[in-house]
């Protein structure tokens, strides 16, 4: 496994603070099951290292991170609506059985 350094990533992202924000957001996404843009089967890197590898390889940028965050938010909202609808149906079924 090639070692990833902050300097490698700073060639892609000029600001250290922006790099930290990008890497932390992406690592959180990877830890939550989002598909990586690099093959991780051989190295099995932890999400933080994998996020830095993706940044250094220019596989991700803020636009991709924001797109994934938006998709995850929409998925969570859709799931919450489905649960709420299922509860309403269950409540209606229970009230029909009480009659």
UniProtKB/Swiss-Prot annotation:
InterPro entries referenced in this protein's UniProt entry, alphabetically: DNA-dir_RNA_pol_omega, Pol_omega/Rpo6/RPB6, RPB6/omega-like_sf
SUPFAM superfamilies (UniProt xref): RPB6/omega subunit-like (SSF63562)
GO BP, sorted A to Z: DNA-templated transcription
The keyword Disulfide bond appears for this protein: no
Statement: the UniProt record of this protein carries the keyword Transcription: yes
Cleavable signal peptide: none
Catalytic activity entry: RNA(n) + a ribonucleoside 5'-triphosphate = RNA(n+1) + diphosphate
Domain of life of the organism encoding this protein: Bacteria
Listed GO CC annotations: DNA-directed RNA polymerase complex
One GO MF term attached to the UniProt entry: DNA binding
SMART domains named in the record: RNA_pol_Rpb6 (SM01409)
Assigned EC number: 2.7.7.6
Pfam short name (any one): RNA_pol_Rpb6
Keyword line: DNA-directed RNA polymerase, Nucleotidyltransferase, Transcription, Transferase
Complexes and interactors: The RNAP catalytic core consists of 2 alpha, 1 beta, 1 beta' and 1 omega subunit. When a sigma factor is associated with the core the holoenzyme is formed, which can initiate transcription.
Family: Belongs to the RNA polymerase subunit omega family.
Function recorded in the entry: Promotes RNA polymerase assembly. Latches the N- and C-terminal regions of the beta' subunit thereby facilitating its interaction with the beta and alpha subunits.
Record HAMAP family: RNApol_bact_RpoZ (MF_00366)
Name of this chain's protein: DNA-directed RNA polymerase subunit omega
Organism listed in the record: Stenotrophomonas maltophilia (strain K279a)
